[in-house]
From Swiss-Prot:
This is Indole-3-pyruvate decarboxylase. The keyword Magnesium applies. Gene3D superfamilies: 3.40.50.970, TPP-binding domain. One of its GO terms (cellular component) is cytosol. SUPFAM superfamilies: DHS-like NAD/FAD-binding domain (SSF52467), Thiamin diphosphate-binding fold (THDP-binding) (SSF52518). GO terms for biological process: aromatic amino acid family catabolic process to alcohol via Ehrlich pathway; auxin biosynthetic process. CDD domains: TPP_PYR_PDC_IPDC_like (cd07038). Keywords: Decarboxylase, Lyase, Magnesium, Metal-binding, Thiamine pyrophosphate. Belongs to the TPP enzyme family. One of its GO terms (molecular function) is indolepyruvate decarboxylase activity. It comes from the Bacteria. Its EC number is 4.1.1.74.
Length: 545
């Protein structure tokens, strides 16, 4: 079996559903094998950042491996930012890079695409991946592939594989199973017992769920765990959309001073806060009204569980959830606490200008009228804060890393592995300038996302923190006018009535991407972003309790 074929089969066997990429001369042999064997569908895009974002989204959507293939140097370095974001947000993207042949560096000449040395790229990716391998030895390649892919699955973070172009067709053995990761069964049982004891002894326990629950495909089991625990459930900012289909869905999303006051009180006054799969990031917790004392929480994350001042190591989240379920009898109790979050509805379809919350109401009205909720791919900015108030079938966004440019390629990547389900993308004009042009690939890829573009001709979120800076002003690019040339339909809307009509048409039209360019006056923010900004200013102006 050829090395490239063995790698592709190993990826498919481990759940990968597609490969996103852009070829280059050092990667041409690998792409040839990928195209001819069709082991994984190959989806090419226009710029490497989008390749990384699309692979990230495919991994998030399917709770499995995403695959991004690029050429050496000029291609791989272009994808560093997207992979760094995937690392930060625990998305298992497999980066495959072509490379110079094993003897090409021996001629005494510098090779095109190389950085400082031929090894520079490998060293750069060591900083943003959890396992790496250069597949330059056919005898060792299968074991190296298994080791690296096993790390991606166990740790839910990106990994890096580099294939010299003269090794692509080398004969190798099939790739075996992933190496076993250590789990101390006695420690796992003791940990589960201690977690349950802490939750039972608390007077105000709360379960807070975050991204690892989805990354490891545990939503159904965690929904059952929440039911058996019978405690209030909330999500983090990054976990928004988790357990949406659970019998008793979460009460809402914790955003500290920017969010629902009752949820904020519930979380911050809890004496038994169970942070399940939660990233302890500033976007999740820096806007707390009162500083949460992590010494009084239970934190399960990154194959470890911390209670107070001690930590259980080598505790996989899936194993912990199973052990907790074994220690709890089945229950049909409903979760205690307030009513679930009430989404804004009732758009007034009139001649008034569009505000971000009008977009949320327009989307929610369609769902209330019987439209099946769509998964939302959101970019960074007020579009993400507005999405927090939309009814959805899941939300993916760079909520922690907070990079721009994720939204459009993420929507493309998600729909490519969705089995035909449509994706709703929300994006600002600043981020659209970066990666929105990837929509030109939708016709060739056979997908038709709906894209709502928040156009205020501004880096508006940056303006909220530094309003005096003129560099926040952007020009009006008239994005909707360009949609037809890229194979889609575009419409610019300025009023709430036009917004409703455009959204109705977009949902009714299949086979072409739909771009709704919603013109929003500068300075008009979603309710959630406005509270977030006010809360940040208040917190920075006065010491915390």
């Amino acid at each position: 079996m050829k090395l490239a074929e063995a790698l592709l089969r190993a990826l498919k066997d481990r759940g990968a559903q597609a490969m996103f990429g852009i070829p280059g001369d050092f990667a041409l042999p690998f792409f040839k094998v990928a195209e001819e064997t069709q082991i994984l569908p190959l989806h090419t895009l226009s710029h490497e950042p989008a390749v990384g974002f699309a692979a990230d989204a495919a991994a998030r959507y399917s709770s499995t491996l995403g695959v991004a293939a690029v050429t050496y140097g000029a291609g791989a370095f272009n994808m560093v930012n997207a992979v760094a974001g995937a690392y930060a947000e625990k998305s298992p993207v497999v980066v495959i890079s072509g490379a110079p042949g094993t003897t090409e560096g021996n001629a005494g000449l510098l090779l095109h695409h190389q950085g400082r040395t031929l090894d520079t790229q490998f060293q750069v990716f060591k900083e943003i991946t959890v396992a790496q391998a250069r597949l330059d030895d056919p005898a060792k390649a299968p074991a190296e592939i298994a080791r690296v892919l096993g790390a991606a699955r166990a740790l839910s973070r990106p990994v890096y594989l580099e294939i010299p172009r003269n090794m692509v067709n080398a004969e190798v053995e099939p790739v075996g199973d992933d190496p076993a990761w250590p789990v101390d069964r006695d420690a796992l049982a003791a940990c589960a017992d201690e977690v349950l004891a802490a939750m039972r002894s608390a007077t105000s326990p709360v379960l807070m769920v975050c991204v690892e629950v989805r990354r490891y495909g545990l939503e159904a089991k965690v929904a059952e765990l929440a039911q058996r625990l019978g405690v209030p459930v909330v999500t983090t900012f990054m976990g928004r959309g988790l357990l949406a289909d659970a019998p008793t869905p979460p009460l809402g999303t914790y955003i500290g001073v920017a969010g629902d006051a009752e949820i904020t009180r519930l979380v911050e006054e809890s004496d038994g806060l169970f942070l399940l799969g939660a990233i302890l990031s500033d976007t999740n917790f820096a806007v707390s009204q009162r500083k949460i004392d992590l010494r009084k929480t239970i934190h399960a994350f990154d194959r470890a569980v911390t209670l107070g001042y001690h930590t259980y190591a080598d505790i996989p989240l899936a194993g912990l959830v199973d052990a907790l379920l074994e220690g709890l009898p089945p229950s049909d109790r409903t979760t205690r606490g307030k009513e679930p979050h009430a989404y804004p509805t009732g758009l007034q379809a009139d001649g008034e200008p569009i505000a971000p919350m009008d977009i949320a109401r327009a989307v929610n009205d369609r769902v209330r009228a019987g439209q099946e909720p769509l998964l939302i791919a959101a970019d960074m900015g007020d579009c993400l804060f507005t999405a927090m108030d939309m009814i959805d079938a899941g939300l993916m966004a760079p909520g922690y890393y907070a990079g721009m440019g994720f939204g459009v390629p993420a929507g493309i990547g998600a729909q490519c592995v969705s089995g035909g389900k449509r994706i709703l993308t929300v994006v600002g004009d600043g981020a659209f300038q970066m990666t929105g042009w990837e929509l030109g690939n939708c016709r060739r890829l056979g997908i038709d996302p709906i894209v709502i573009l928040f156009n205020n001709a501004s880096w508006e979120m940056l303006r909220t923190f530094q309003p005096e800076s003129a560099f926040n002003d952007l020009d009006d690019w008239r994005f909707a006018d360009m949609a037809a040339g890229m194979g889609g339909d575009g419409v610019r809307v300025r009023t709430r009535a036009e917004l409703k009509a455009a959204l109705d048409k977009a949902f009714a039209t299949r086979g072409r991407f739909q771009l709704i360019e919603a013109m929003i006056p500068r300075g008009v923010l979603s309710d959630t972003l406005a509270r977030f900004v006010q809360g940040q200013k208040r917190l920075h102006a006065a010491p915390r309790e």
